[in-house]
Amino acid sequence: MAKKKIAISCGDIQGVGLELILKSHKEVSALCEPLYLIDSELLERANQLLNNAYETKTLNTLAINAPLPLLNSGTIGKVSAQSGAYSFESFKKACELADDKEVDGICTLPINKLAWQQAQIPFVGHTDFLKQRYKDHQIIMMLGCFRLFVGLFSDHVPLGAVSQLIQVKALVRFLLAFQKSTQAKIIQVCGFNPHAGEEGLFGKEDAKILKAIQKSNQTLGFECFLGPLPADSAFAPNKRKITPFYVSMSHDVGLAPLKALYFDESINVSLNAPILRASTDHGTAFDIAYQNKANNKSYVNAIKYLA
């Protein structure tokens, strides 16, 4: 059986992305046919900064239509508009290749959101770009590993704005799209307020969540969604035995327990998109850039998910 062709966007080159590419190539190429969306010259520079520890000649690369950022001992670990622009163009090219069916999926290495902002890129990050590019699809951010997956009803929005987003119709649409994408038989839904609202004592949002759960289960014809569960106990061991699939109303409520349990191995997946996309579930790690300290478990797991 032929290996799948996966486009790998380079992420912010001042972080750990290029180290992950170089140190993981042998393992990744055993899983898929990787196409690295980066100018080969930058990989050579990265390898020099890593004391020429890796082989670079056998990597299949595709040059990006963007100015080459500086990459040297003075730039690594620092926010750069030029690096932000380059990482965006690498990611956009990956999407174009996937749209044209030239690759089977894309793996995105971590970007720096401030670098994108400095480069005047009008998107908060990868998922925001995908939501704008594929407006007819409800793109869902799901993070985790095969032991625990968390779907985020809201992702990169201020916590104070989440309450207004919790509306029955929008949540039903989200829940059904999440179930369709994952094919999960049981999904536990975290509440929004302390004690999942305590029957209205602590806010009205959880009553809306309950109504959305009931409507979604009715549409599916079986009791798929459980909750709303008090979020402070939703991830207890006895709860995680029920199902690996969860939904969180906000970013940190779902991701704090996930990263406490499975930080090194978790991945980020864009569900319900017309293309297949997975990513590492960590940032650029500027503090350890080019020190040969990057853990590649999340990156390899993202490739495994795509392959």
Swiss-Prot record:
- Subunit structure as annotated in this protein's UniProt entry: Homodimer.
Keywords, ordered alphabetically: Cobalt, Cytoplasm, Magnesium, Metal-binding, NAD, NADP, Oxidoreductase, Pyridoxine biosynthesis, Zinc
**SUPFAM superfamilies named among the record's database cross-references:** Isocitrate/Isopropylmalate dehydrogenase-like
Q: Which branch of life, at top level?
A: Bacteria
Q: At which positions is a divalent metal cation bound?
A: 156, 195, 251
Q: Name one GO molecular function term.
A: zinc ion binding
Q: What class of enzyme is it?
A: oxidoreductase
Q: Which cofactor does it need?
A: Zn(2+); Mg(2+); Co(2+)
The reply on keyword Magnesium is yes
- Tell me where it mainly resides: cytoplasm
Task: Name the Gene3D superfamilies for this protein.
Answer: Isopropylmalate Dehydrogenase
GO biological process terms, alphabetically, are: pyridoxal phosphate biosynthetic process; pyridoxine biosynthetic process
Q: What is this protein called?
A: 4-hydroxythreonine-4-phosphate dehydrogenase
Q: Report the sequence similarity comment from the record.
A: Belongs to the PdxA family.
Q: What else is known?
A: The active site is located at the dimer interface.
**Protein task:** Catalyzes the NAD(P)-dependent oxidation of 4-(phosphooxy)-L-threonine (HTP) into 2-amino-3-oxo-4-(phosphooxy)butyric acid which spontaneously decarboxylates to form 3-amino-2-oxopropyl phosphate (AHAP).
Give the catalytic activity: 4-(phosphooxy)-L-threonine + NAD(+) = 3-amino-2-oxopropyl phosphate + CO2 + NADH
Keyword hit for Ribosomal protein: no
